């Protein structure tokens, strides 16, 4: 059995959160009743080190609402693992900035989902979130910490993209744009992007990438943003080739109660086990993840697509959100381009 290396793990340390974001796939707010203890979480951190994980993203909920987060992060860093700390940036204090500096993380990630306070705060569910986030970004950068921003798109904020671009331009902030899935309870399915709206967002990213140099606006589409387009050559990073979704192949997600999935964004029926019952090594090298590393059974358009063997139906989360199954992804630029609108 050929066991791949673990490129990336996204670890939800707690579901507790001080915001109530509309698109949150985990419907974060209150902590899970059975979250890992510090002792259990430290064991998981040791196992990630033993697995030689390249990078671990620590997040919530809101990570700063779990008091032992610095100890867990230090354990990973001491083991040679790159750490990304993802926070909504509304609870940043001088003490936390000092903790982050000592940690030497790869990136501090945060979210901006609107180009002004009114739109951002409506989506994030709490007033003044926008102002606090921008102030925190300034404070983090002033201390030499690298900041990245994610914008999660729904029909509610699609047309905020130009305003967000103006906000981030020239600030040395890496910007990732991604589409919302349907995992949470706060977002209506009617608020999910349609395929053409998804394509519009891609056109916008591609235009930014050809208009502004990377030093001015380093923007990318997340890996859910398109495969095998015949028209959007500037969308992806040069040299980047899509070879199928990494969920369960070279990435995994850990929930705050120890449940493990190939990707943290996938719904609960994709849980493959729990670290309280099996070690991460046993799960990673076991039969369940081995099944994820086999070729994906493709359906519908993807079954006959000339790119299907390499692409395998794109992002698993979006495929499941829009078609209910792996290997059938309506949110595919090649598929959209083959529709009558483009013929």
Regions found by a protein language model. Name each.
Residues 14, 29, 62, 89-90, ...:
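Short beta->alpha junction loops/turns
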Residues 20, 24, 66, 95, ...:
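Residues that scaffold the ATP/ADP-binding catalytic core of kinase and kinase-like folds
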Residues 47-60, 329-343:
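Short Fe-S-cluster ligation motifs
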Residues 173, 223-340:
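Accessory C-terminal segments flanking Radical SAM cores
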Residues 41, 198-201, 280:
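Hydrophobic/aromatic residues in well-formed alpha-helices
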Residues 1-107:
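Conserved alpha-helical substructure of the radical SAM core
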Residues 36, 102-106, 111-113, 118-247, ...:
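Radical SAM enzyme [4Fe-4S]-AdoMet core and its adjacent flexible, acidic
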């Amino acid at each position: 059995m050929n066991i791949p290396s673990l490129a990336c793990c996204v670890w939800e340390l707690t579901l507790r959160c001080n915001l109530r974001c509309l698109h949150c796939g985990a419907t974060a707010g209150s902590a899970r009743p059975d979250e890992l203890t510090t002792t259990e979480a430290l064991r998981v951190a040791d196992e990630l080190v033993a697995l030689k994980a390249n990078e671990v993203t620590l997040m919530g909920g809101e990570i700063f609402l779990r008091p032992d987060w610095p100890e867990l992060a230090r354990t990973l860093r001491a083991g040679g693992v790159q750490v990304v700390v993802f926070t909504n940036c509304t609870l940043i204090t001088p003490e936390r900035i000092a903790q982050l500096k000592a940690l030497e993380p790869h990136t501090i990630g945060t979210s901006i989902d609107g180009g002004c306070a009114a739109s951002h705060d409506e989506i994030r569910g709490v007033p003044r979130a926008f102002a606090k986030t921008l102030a925190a970004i300034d404070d983090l950068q002033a201390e030499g910490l690298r900041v990245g921003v994610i914008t999660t798109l729904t029909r509610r904020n699609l047309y905020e993209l130009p305003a967000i671009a103006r906000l981030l331009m020239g600030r040395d902030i890496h910007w990732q744009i991604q589409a919302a899935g349907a995992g949470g309870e706060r977002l209506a399915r009617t608020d999910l992007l349609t395929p053409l709206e998804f394509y519009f967002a891609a056109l916008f990213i591609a235009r930014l990438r050809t208009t502004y140099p990377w030093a001015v606006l380093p923007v990318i589409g997340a890996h859910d943003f398109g495969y095998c387009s015949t028209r959007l050559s500037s969308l992806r990073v040069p040299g980047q080739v899509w070879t199928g979704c990494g969920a369960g192949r070279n990435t995994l997600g850990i929930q705050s109660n120890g449940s493990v999935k190939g990707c943290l964004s996938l719904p609960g029926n994709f849980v493959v086990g729990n670290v309280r019952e099996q070690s991460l090594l046993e799960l990673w090298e076991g039969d369940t993840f081995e099944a994820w590393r086999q070729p994906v059974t493709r359906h519908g358009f993807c079954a006959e697509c000339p790119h299907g063997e390499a692409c395998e139906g794109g992002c698993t989360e979006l495929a499941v959100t829009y078609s209910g199954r792996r290997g059938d992804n309506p949110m595919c630029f090649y598929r959209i381009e083959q529709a009558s609108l483009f013929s």
